[in-house]
Amino acid sequence: MVNYPNGRSQSYSAVPKKQKTLTGLSVAKKGAPKSKSLVAFGKRGMNFEAEINATNDYYLSRGLAVIHKKPTPIQIVKVDYPQRSRAKITEAYFRQASTTDYSGVYKGHYVDFEAKETHQKTVFPLKNFHEHQIVHMSNVLAQRGIAFILLHFAALDETYLLPSSYLITFYYEKNGLKSIPLAYIRENGYKIETNHIPRIPYLEIVNKLCEVQ
């Protein structure tokens, strides 16, 4: 039996001043209709984490990047020994992850990121982030690694990449705010237009982040 800690989410987890456009990345303008070619996550039968994993598998198969999801640490509580040579775990608990969801290498750069999902329409709750994750991303940036967060607004079917530097700044200077406004994310992050293959083409943005390292 495996138990999740209480409160653990099973999903992942001001007006913009500028719009950003990258090669191969379409940035939607405010009020612009969504492309009919886009398909909602739910309609494809995959959740946000599965979409990212499928994208990482695609990148790996094409030799573009090596990025994997970090395993969730487990604390074993009870073990039975039905046979002398075999052990059976009968009770265990998922422990809180100490860093972020994903890490790997892209073009010689260390890449580290967290993926979160919300059903809110105008804000992203800060409670989805723990201080030890903020500290970890700060340490990655200090070593000149690439760190960011992928944020999916399920109700809007919108996905953004926000460089960790903006999350860290907002986290420590939030002035009592408990959520990150969507406007802040749109202003400082990049909107990702989902594709069929790869699902979430975030490397197009990471490539830009590498150029300004």
UniProtKB/Swiss-Prot annotation:
Q: How is the cofactor bound?
A: Binds 1 Mg(2+) ion per subunit.
Positions of the record's site feature: Transition state stabilizer:
K116
| GO molecular function list | endonuclease activity; magnesium ion binding; nucleic acid binding
Which reaction is catalysed here?
Answer: Endonucleolytic cleavage at a junction such as a reciprocal single-stranded crossover between two homologous DNA duplexes (Holliday junction)
Note the InterPro entries from the entry: Resolv_RecU, Restrct_endonuc-II-like, tRNA_endonuc-like_dom_sf
Binding of Mg(2+): at which residues? T99, D101, E114, Q133
At the top level of its lineage, which domain of life is listed? Bacteria
- One matching Pfam family is RecU
**Entry cofactors:** Mg(2+)
**Cellular component annotations (GO), alphabetically ordered:** cytoplasm
Alphabetical keyword list: Cytoplasm, DNA damage, DNA recombination, DNA repair, Endonuclease, Hydrolase, Magnesium, Metal-binding, Nuclease
Q: What EC number is given for this enzyme?
A: 3.1.21.10
Question: Mainly localized where?
Answer: cytoplasm
Which residue windows are coiled coil? none
Query: Can you say where in the cell this protein is located?
Result: Cytoplasm
Q: Which EC main class describes this enzyme?
A: hydrolase
| GO-annotated biological processes | chromosome segregation; DNA recombination; DNA repair
Please name the HAMAP family in this protein's record: RecU (MF_00130)
Q: Which family does it belong to?
A: Belongs to the RecU family.
Its biological purpose: Endonuclease that resolves Holliday junction intermediates in genetic recombination. Cleaves mobile four-strand junctions by introducing symmetrical nicks in paired strands. Promotes annealing of linear ssDNA with homologous dsDNA. Required for DNA repair, homologous recombination and chromosome segregation.
NCBIfam families referenced in this protein's UniProt entry, alphabetically: PRK02234.1-1 (NF002580), PRK02234.1-5 (NF002584), recU (TIGR00648)
State the protein's name.
Holliday junction resolvase RecU
